[in-house]
Amino acid sequence: MQTTHLFALTAAVGSIWLLSSCETTQPTPTTTAAPRARITVLFDAFGKDVAMTKDWGYAALVEINGKRILFDTGNDAAVLAKNVKAKGVDLTKLDFVVLSHRHSDHVSGLSYVLSVNPHVKIYAPKEGFGIFGSDLPSKFFRKDDSLPAGMRYYNGAPPETMKFGTLFPGANIQLIDKTTEVTPSITLIALTSEAPGTKELKELSLTIDTPDGVVLVVGCSHPGIEAIVAEALKINQHIHFLTGGFHLVVAQNPVIEKVANALHDTYKVDFIAPGHCTGEPAFTALQKVFGDRYLYAGLGTTLSMRASPRAASNQGGALGLDDGDSRSYRTLLAKSDDLHETGVSVVRLAGVQ
């Protein structure tokens, strides 16, 4: 009888020990780190990172909502390659590329991107006879059945849809004709320029809808920065962050002041980080209007997209262009296509000799 009780007691103690040991070996809960939300400037004509090469144009790596997006590719493939390597960016892990428009200072680096990631998806604006490829229904031209076959297009039997070539054969390009949500919370705005010199040019801008509001990345803003922001407000009535080229480099001071005040007072943009073709006078005006909500976005800068991205920027010191920035910016501007839109008046405005 005592042996039976002793056996039962031993079994009970063993069970308690086993249960307690199981409890102590349960894995402790772990918290999943939030996905990165940041923008790194890979191509521009001003900046303080001595490891990178300045050139006129724009490219930025956008890492947000779990996606890695290359927005534009700059003016020179070799320069983009050097800058990408300097920042340790792996272009083989892109989710997709966005080409804002067809100008060379935004698309010339694509050849390098394709050399390391030949099958990456590329979004580009759809334009008739555009460099990214296009098509038209053959009914767009008038026919004359009285002509002999040798005088008729396609011997009088054209295809229903005429497809046109691209400068990037074999690339995985998807053409965007209208504002389109390409993946949940990420939308490409498609607008057309009405400005002299770029009339009918179609441009894409990138919007990411976040809990803090819209993050808006623009390439050159040929359709007008105010028009692009107004379109973004249809996605979310709050613009949290705006960066890229505002195309005020050719504008006179009254226009610059009007746009700066509109972005601040009318559209109520939280934070602003202008670059590329925004222009030196516009940098100054926007700093004055936005104060500590203006972020320096020179070449090599990484901007963290948080509720207060100013605190997370890795750029210290002055917000504006220093003397070296200004000299390089003006020199590269003088060589760019942006000068050709309004001629000598731009040279005077930019202070280029």
Kindly label every feature range from the protein language model.
Residues 106, 121, 205, 211-302:
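Cap/insert and terminal regions of metallo-dependent hydrolase folds
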Residues 19-21:
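C-terminal motif of bacterial Sec signal peptides marking the signal peptidase cleavage site
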Residues 62, 72, 84, 101, ...:
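Divalent metal-coordination and catalytic microenvironments
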Residues 128-203, 290, 295-308:
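Metallo-beta-lactamase
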Residues 78-123, 127, 233-243, 247:
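Active-site metal-binding motif and surrounding structural segment of the metallo-beta-lactamase
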Residues 169, 262-334, 339-341, 346:
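Binuclear metal-ion centers of metallo-dependent hydrolases, dominated by the metallo-beta-lactamase
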Residues 38-87, 199-217:
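Conserved beta-strand hairpin/beta-sheet module of binuclear metal-dependent hydrolase folds
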Residues 1-8:
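Bacterial N-terminal signal peptides that target proteins for export
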